[in-house]
Curated annotation (Swiss-Prot):
GTP binds at D29, G30, K31, G32, F33, H34, S75, D76. It catalyses: a 5'-end ribonucleotide-tRNA(His) + GTP + ATP + H2O = a 5'-end phospho-guanosine-ribonucleotide-tRNA(His) + AMP + 2 diphosphate + H(+). Mg(2+) 1 binds at D29, G30, D76. InterPro entries: Thg1_C_dom, tRNAHis_GuaTrfase_cat, tRNAHis_GuaTrfase_Thg1, tRNAHis_GuaTrfase_Thg1_sf. This is tRNA(His) guanylyltransferase. The keyword Transit peptide does not apply. Keywords: GTP-binding, Magnesium, Metal-binding, Nucleotide-binding, Nucleotidyltransferase, Transferase, tRNA processing. Its EC number is 2.7.7.79. It comes from Debaryomyces hansenii (strain ATCC 36239 / CBS 767 / BCRC 21394 / JCM 1990 / NBRC 0083 / IGC 2968) (Yeast). Its cofactor is Mg(2+). Belongs to the tRNA(His) guanylyltransferase family. Gene3D superfamilies: 3.30.70.3000. One of its GO terms (molecular function) is magnesium ion binding. Adds a GMP to the 5'-end of tRNA(His) after transcription and RNase P cleavage.
Length: 265
């Protein structure tokens, strides 16, 4: 940047450098996607093609930044886990948040055009995302965070599945369906689906019930201070070349995490 007498204005800029040696989770969320889904006539209660667009945009982000170890997505939301030793953008909060939000926004549009060539995106209703970042100090916090998001996915999907079944198959208005579901718990909704419509919720697709987990999979070598510089470089190279695999399974129990210890290094 050229020197000038006006450069003093940079003194007003402030950077928030996030705590070192802590886990970072960046969560991106669609802005106004309720209206967006109505505008472009998403299938109800779930649009598998729209989920594919979101999942592919998230994969593109992971491919761009090897420090992202895993991601969890549901609907128009995605959470990205950055490894504890991550130094991406010097851990500057504003840089991370703005980059993730803009990257997902443009990649969502790119993937949309591939998946929905028959649905032209209009200027009046563009897909945009905001982002936030949270610092977590322990493995327990990370696991509890992703458990929270997956439980939320289940609760929302069961409600939406029941709501739209009442509307589409039961002939109710949206207000009538809301009133019928008012005060119900999960067992009530399951019983309603099965007794009134012959739908066993357990047979619904796992992607809808459990969301999408993206994982950087590679031959694991434990990182640590005892590794030589060459060994550390080899591990970093493996991480960059790692395949990004998609799963729809339980991440609340121990199995998923025990099989992938590198995620929480």
């Amino acid at each position: 940047m050229a020197k000038s007498r006006f450069e003093y204005v940079k003194q007003f800029e402030r950077e928030n450098f996030l705590l070192p040696d802590t886990y970072l989770i960046v969560r991106v969320d669609g802005k106004g996607f309720h209206k967006f889904s109505e505008e472009y006539e998403f299938s109800k209660p779930n649009d598998i093609r729209a989920l594919k667009v979101m999942n592919n945009a998230a994969k593109n982000l992971m491919a761009q930044f090897p420090d992202i170890m895993m991601a969890y997505g549901d609907s128009d939301e995605y959470s990205f886990l950055l490894r504890r030793k991550c130094s991406l953008f010097e851990r500057r909060e504003m840089k991370l948040v703005s980059t993730f939000a803009s990257f997902i926004s443009v990649n969502y549009l790119y993937e949309w055009n591939l998946e929905f060539p028959e649905k032209q995106i209009r200027l009046e209703r563009l897909p945009t995302f905001d982002a936030r970042i949270v610092v977590y100090p322990t493995i327990k916090h990370i696991r509890d965070y992703f458990s929270w998001r997956q439980v939320d996915c289940h609760i929302n999907n069961l409600y939406n599945t029941t709501f739209w079944t009442l509307v589409i198959k039961g002939g109710m208005t949206g207000r009538e369906a809301e009133n019928k579901l008012l005060g119900t718990v999960s067992s009530d909704k399951n019983e309603m689906l099965f007794k009134e419509f012959g739908i066993n919720y357990n047979n619904e697709s796992e992607i809808f019930k459990k969301g999408t987990i993206l994982v950087r999979e590679y031959d694991y070598t434990r990182e640590g201070d005892d590794l030589s510089k060459r060994q550390q470089q080899r591990v970093e190279k493996q991480r960059k070349k790692a395949s990004i695999e998609e799963y729809h399974l339980d991440i609340i129990g121990d199995t998923f995490w025990n099989e992938r210890p590198w995620l929480l290094e």
